[in-house]
């Protein structure tokens, strides 16, 4: 009996902590404006290019006063035909407003990142969206 009660308590604590983690993640993502960027490198397998890009991008994101959520990703090993895994890096940022995203475009940290890394990519596609 005692073991069942302890087990139920542990399951309850674990379940409530998982809900809290989900809520924290949801609260950190500002739903007002999302900015998704895909980069295709000229030399996607070049380790030095990747290291340069990652260092510059992390420096930029640490110094951006406008970007809220900051996610950097690489393509997964896609197994479904509908998944485009042709890009080298993805970047997902959220902003409190379209105006904040516009200000981010001209902030110094963003411009320095572009200057440092624009020679690495051959293609960039941006998808912006406003929350509903």
Show where each model-derived region lies.
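Hydrophobic alpha-helical membrane context
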Residues: 14-16, 109
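Surface-exposed, polar helix/loop patches in the mature regions of secreted/periplasmic/lumenal proteins
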Residues: 89-132
């Amino acid at each position: 009996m005692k073991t069942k009660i302890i087990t139920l308590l542990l399951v309850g604590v674990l379940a409530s902590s998982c809900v809290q983690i989900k809520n924290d993640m949801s609260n950190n993502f500002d739903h007002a404006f999302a900015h998704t960027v895909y980069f295709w490198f000229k030399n996607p397998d070049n380790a030095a290019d990747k290291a340069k890009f990652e260092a510059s991008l992390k420096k930029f994101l640490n110094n951006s006063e406008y970007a809220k959520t900051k996610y950097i990703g690489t393509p997964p090993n896609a197994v479904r035909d509908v998944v485009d895994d042709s890009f080298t890096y993805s970047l997902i940022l959220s902003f409190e407003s379209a105006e904040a995203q516009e200000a981010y475009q001209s902030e110094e940290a963003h411009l320095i990142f572009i200057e440092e890394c624009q020679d690495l990519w051959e293609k960039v596609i941006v998808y912006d969206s406003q929350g509903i």
